[in-house]
């Protein structure tokens, strides 16, 4: 079986050179789930960029929910058709708009809870307890925790509930990730870049190769995990 690279958390809409990014993805056959930060961008990107190697996710970044409440109805409009959801979640770096974030994320989870076809990439910075509480233990969608930075206690809870984790090149250099590796099941680890937010000055494909090779050295087959994720 031919093994490909994949990227479960990428921001095509924020790339300086979108067409160059698409060419790179296609040339290197990188199966990519690209996030959107607002729901009106989703339909635009599906029509312009959706193809074999690019899956467009419907998203509403938590830090933007309070700024664009008029766009929430668009999220619900497109939700039924979108298999991939992201970037969504909670960000409590600044808690001044936590109430709006919680209300939106709670409604999103309620609408997706029984949909086994949905794959949701979740942002959880500083809000892991709330994420766990809102999602609970009774859900049919597939959650992916993107760039997890929470406690080991919450990590164990997340692992027990069957979440996936997406891992980037900035994460694998940390002592914390070495600790995380002791708990995360090997069949629940996926690749991501979070490009353009990762600080490493390397190409999209090189960033993925570095992480993939690191994980392979620990006996983790991320490509097999990705195929399982998408049901291929």
Set out the residue ranges of the language-model regions:
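Mid-domain alpha/beta scaffold segments of enzyme catalytic cores
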Residues: 1-232
């Amino acid at each position: 079986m031919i093994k490909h690279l994949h990227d479960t958390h990428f921001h095509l809409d924020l790339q300086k050179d979108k067409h160059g990014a698409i060419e790179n993805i296609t040339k290197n056959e990188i199966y990519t789930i690209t996030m959107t930060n607002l729901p009106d961008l989703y339909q635009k990107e599906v029509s312009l960029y959706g193809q074999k190697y690019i899956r467009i996710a419907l998203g509403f970044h938590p830090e933007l929910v309070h700024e664009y409440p008029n766009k929430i109805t668009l999220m619900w409009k497109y939700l039924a058709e979108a298999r991939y959801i992201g970037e969504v979640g909670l960000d409590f770096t600044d808690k001044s708009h936590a109430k709006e974030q919680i209300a939106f994320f709670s409604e999103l989870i309620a609408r997706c809870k029984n949909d086994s076809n949905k794959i949701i990439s979740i942002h959880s910075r500083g809000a892991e307890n709330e994420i766990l509480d809102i999602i609970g233990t009774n859900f049919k969608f597939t959650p992916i925790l993107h760039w997890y930075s929470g406690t080991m206690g919450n990590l164990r809870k997340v692992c027990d509930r069957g979440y996936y984790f997406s891992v980037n090149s900035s994460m694998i250099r940390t002592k914390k990730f070495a600790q995380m590796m002791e708990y995360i099941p090997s069949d629940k680890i996926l690749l991501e870049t979070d490009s353009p937010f990762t600080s490493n000055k390397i190409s999209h494909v090189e960033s993925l190769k570095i992480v993939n090779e690191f994980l392979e050295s620990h006996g983790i087959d991320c490509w097999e995990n990705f195929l399982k994720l998408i049901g291929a």
